[in-house]
Design a protein with these regions (language model features):
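Basic, polar low-complexity surface loops/patches
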Residues: 1-168
Length: 168
């Protein structure tokens, strides 16, 4: 609820063989939108993580509940922030990640009480997104998923990379 990130660590060496402090590595980072523990999640409520991307063509929005696998992608051809705010209200995500182009993070936090985590625009590069998604889904292109718009790729790619980084 507070928006914290929690690092999960494990010992990586046998304490009997260690000289001094036992070596530990971070194996996973849990954020509000990547919680999978049913004891922590509210029963009957989805736990969405949302990714927002803005460029000159408009907005891309990717929403996922990692506990159920639900994944929805949409885009808006104009730059009307109210449509994005409607998407946020519709899903009420636990966490929002976005690119530098999203300049209304303070408004999102004020209206919905959800903090945004901002990533550099290069994290949303179209070519990287296309390659990453095709590799992930083991396809030559993404037309079979109904994804053929550049603005959507950046969102999906960032979400997949973010999810891989946090959840392994």
């Amino acid at each position: 609820e507070k928006g914290y990130k929690v690092a999960i660590c494990e010992q990586t060496e046998d304490p009997k063989k260690a000289k001094g402090i036992v070596k530990r590595d971070v194996i996973r980072i849990v954020t509000p939108g990547t919680v999978l523990d049913t004891n922590i999640l509210d029963e009957g409520r989805n736990n969405y993580i949302m990714c927002l991307f803005k460029n000159v063509d408009g907005f891309g929005v990717a929403t996922c509940d990692v506990s159920t696998g639900e994944f929805v992608v949409t885009s808006f051809e104009d730059t009307a922030e109210n449509k994005v705010m409607d998407e946020i209200a519709k899903y009420m995500p636990s966490e929002i990640i976005c690119n530098d182009g999203i300049d209304f993070g303070d408004q999102i936090e004020r209206v919905f009480g959800i903090k945004t985590a901002t990533y550099n625009d290069w994290s949303f590069d179209y070519q990287n997104a296309n390659i990453c998604l095709c590799n992930h889904f083991k396809t030559l292109n993404l037309c079979g998923f109904g994804i053929d718009d550049d603005s959507r790729y950046g969102n999906d790619w960032l979400f997949l990379c973010f999810h891989r980084k946090l959840c392994g």
